[in-house]
Amino acid sequence: MEEMILEKDLLSITRKNVDAFLETHDVKYVAEDAVYKHLGTGDEYNGREAIGAMLNYMYHVAFDAHAEVTNKIITENKAMFEGKFIGRHIGEFAGIPPTNKEINVPICVCYDLEDGLIKKGRIYFLGDVLMKQLAQ
């Protein structure tokens, strides 16, 4: 019985942490040795600091953007969200100077979790959709 209660407590903490991360992108919810991989480009970000820098660049430097979550699943050791990366292109991205164009790009991220923190992230981002929107 005690083990079941502890599992429920960990799941509750994990859900709160993942929900908070999806809302804020605060890397305190990311393990120090976490790894993110962008499956479309092969780019890999190793460690909390590198992941934080990538998130800051995407959400605040290249774009003024946010993630709009349309679906999510959170378990004790896995999480997934599907949604849209929505915002405005305000800084250099992939050699393209700021266009000030609105963007709305489908995104899905799958996470491996450990002790309530994100340990691995696999990013599925439709870069071709983004590039079309920046070119229009």
Where are these regions (language model features)?
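C-terminal and inter-domain tail/linker signature
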Residues: 1-136
